[in-house]
Amino acid sequence: MVDATVGHGGHSLLFGRSLGPEGILVGLDIDPPSLERARERLASLTCRVILVKSNFACLAERLGELGIEKVDFILADLGFNSAQLADAEMGLSFRTEDMPLDMRIDKSLTTTAADIVNGYDEKSLADLIFEYGQDRASRRIARYIVRRRQQERITTTGQLVEIVCSALRTPGGKHRPRKHPATRTFQALRIAVNRELENLDRLLATAPKLLRTGGYLAVISFHSLEDGRVKWDFKRNQQEGVYRLLTRKPIVADPKEIAENRRARSAKLRIAQRN
């Protein structure tokens, strides 16, 4: 099996226990600290464990390098772990201490969130926040960003939170019901910096070529842009006779799981089987 986003190894540990000594588990992650945590966590498994530093967009290339042509199961959990959200160097969160406005999971990428915020023109910023953040106030937010950067370079998450809150006339220390005002802007920047949708599209396009007949593709998404892509891809492949859908509607977390893990409230699981 392939865990395309191995993270700290939680999913891999669960599935790896059922593989046995003859099984092979390949785990990919672009974040080195996550790979080290996974290596420690999966050490007790009896199956062969291969961990690779790579984005799942390059899954076909990585499997080719390992001499693996077909697999029985591909799992992709598109969420972030708590350690990444708390990592000051990544600057992914607006809820923790003031962080550098970076947002790169893969440090080999050259463009940071600060580069976008300080470099894009107002229209491009507004379009990005609207398309990737789905924020109807995108033009107003972009206007406030441009106004602030004319005074000083925007380099920290705290600065950006303050700007967005000002644009939405929300005091920096208060949240609107259920969702922080900066949520959508941060989502848009994170998606753009890490090329998340482009990478997901590449994985979805590659999966049918890698799965054996009867093999499974399972994707856990966390916002509508991801889920919409997965839903469309699964439906198209079903119509073309490539997949059989095992989830007509996405599987979502029950109240007990949400109580234990608040981020699970946004998770949607879709599963397809290769014909």
Task: Please report, for each region that a protein language model flagged, where it lies by residue.
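S-adenosyl-L-methionine-dependent methyltransferase catalytic core, i.e., the SAM/SAH-binding region
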Residues: 1-275
